[in-house]
């Protein structure tokens, strides 16, 4: 990670790059392969490889029927649902447990909105555990032509008070929600379950606006140090200038500055499970896994660290789970980091967020990718 400053350009523009390669992605997914963008960052004695699934790791579940009981339904909104799939009951439960927060339900929700140059941005939903924070922001008053991708010029995200202090740094990627989600097998579809469509130029058609003409920007932030926690922290988010993006280039359309300080929920939803099993074909033993409804951290002891392969560190990656009812979610994890946690390379970890909420009590086994050649094994866990 750069030591200059904690300012992130909106560089993780997965939609255009990914969507232009959707056909290739389909073929690879059918072979149970996955495309991912990798970046290796070295910081002191800690080595991290940042990665994000190239088939946009976002998904949605339609809202279920209205309860006959007069109760508040904590609906997370289109963008958050598109980022981390949750059933109606899961949304309700996580919000009532203060793991998630729906800002539009707050009495002072109107005071949270920031308007500049006729464009209003306001926080919508936050879902948090120790390692990851998912944040969605609604955008009103800005419109783009069909076939163009909206975006901000610069997005700055940091925790604490001083963006120059290393302790304030977070890993982050973000983009405008485009209405495209993965199904349980990782194949991209529209949020209503229909197959993707292309325009006359062969580009996949995206759906950035909702029925009200509003958009949502989605951020996934995670800790830099595997021992840090985001619970109860203040997350600063700043957006500058709106425009469009094409092949990585930003074209400004509206100047503006929208600044937010978001206090994250402070309730822990993670539990530590002792595994103590060797990862077959590797020199790694999965000692424990810290797992929550929205992310996990696999903790390894290392008998012998392998030689890296290009940008691959050789650390096994937990990519999915098998549930007790037999359901397989082979592409559950979506973005995260991995690295050796000491200079001797005798310990390592892999942290990753999910593309959908899971019930930790229903997890029977982990699907682990053991090498850059994408060999897979299942490791049963008990709780």
What role is predicted for each listed range?
Residues 39, 54, 312-314:
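Intrinsic structural disorder/low-complexity segments
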Residues 1-46:
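Disordered, charged N-terminal biogenesis/targeting segments of membrane/secreted proteins
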Residues 10, 22, 30, 66-383:
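Alpha-helical, hydrophobic structural elements that either
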Residues 41-72:
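Internal signal-anchor transmembrane helix that establishes type II topology
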């Amino acid at each position: 990670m750069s030591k200059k400053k904690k300012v992130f350009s909106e560089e993780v523009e997965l939609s255009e790059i990914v969507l232009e390669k959707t056909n290739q992605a389909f073929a690879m997914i059918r072979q149970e392969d996955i495309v991912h963008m990798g970046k290796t960052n070295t910081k002191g004695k800690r080595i991290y490889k940042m990665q994000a699934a190239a088939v946009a790791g976002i998904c949605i579940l339609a809202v279920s029927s209205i309860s006959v009981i007069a109760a508040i339904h904590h609906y997370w909104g289109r963008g958050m649902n598109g980022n981390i799939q949750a059933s109606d009951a899961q949304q309700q439960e996580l919000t009532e447990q203060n793991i998630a927060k729906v800002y539009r339900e707050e009495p002072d929700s109107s005071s949270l909105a920031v308007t500049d140059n006729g464009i209003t941005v306001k926080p919508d939903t936050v879902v948090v555990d120790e390692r990851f924070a998912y944040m969605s922001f609604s955008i009103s008053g800005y419109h783009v032509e069909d076939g163009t991708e909206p975006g901000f010029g610069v997005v700055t995200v940091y925790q604490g008070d001083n963006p120059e202090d290393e302790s304030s740094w977070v890993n982050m990627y973000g983009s405008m929600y485009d209405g495209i989600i993965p199904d349980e097998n990782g194949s991209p579809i529209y949020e209503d379950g229909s197959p993707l469509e292309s325009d006359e130029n062969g580009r996949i058609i995206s759906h950035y606006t909702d029925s009200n003409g509003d958009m949502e920007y989605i951020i996934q932030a995670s800790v830099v140090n595997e021992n840090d926690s985001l619970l109860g922290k203040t997350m600063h988010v700043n957006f500058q200038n709106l425009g469009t993006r094409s092949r990585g280039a930003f074209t400004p359309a509206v100047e503006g500055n929208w600044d937010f300080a978001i206090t994250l929920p402070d309730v822990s939803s993670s539990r530590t499970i002792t595994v103590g099993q060797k990862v077959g074909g590797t020199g790694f033993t999965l000692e424990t896994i810290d797992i929550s409804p929205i992310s996990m951290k696999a903790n390894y002891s290392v008998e012998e660290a392998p030689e890296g392969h290009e940008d691959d560190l050789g650390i096994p990656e937990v990519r999915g789970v098998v549930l007790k009812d037999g359901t397989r979610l082979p592409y559950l994890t979506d973005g995260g980091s991995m690295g050796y946690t000491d200079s001797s390379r005798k310990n390592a970890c892999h942290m990753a967020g999910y593309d959908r909420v899971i019930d930790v009590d229903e997890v029977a086994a982990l699907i682990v990718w053991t090498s850059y050649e994408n060999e897979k094994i299942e490791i049963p866990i008990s709780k």
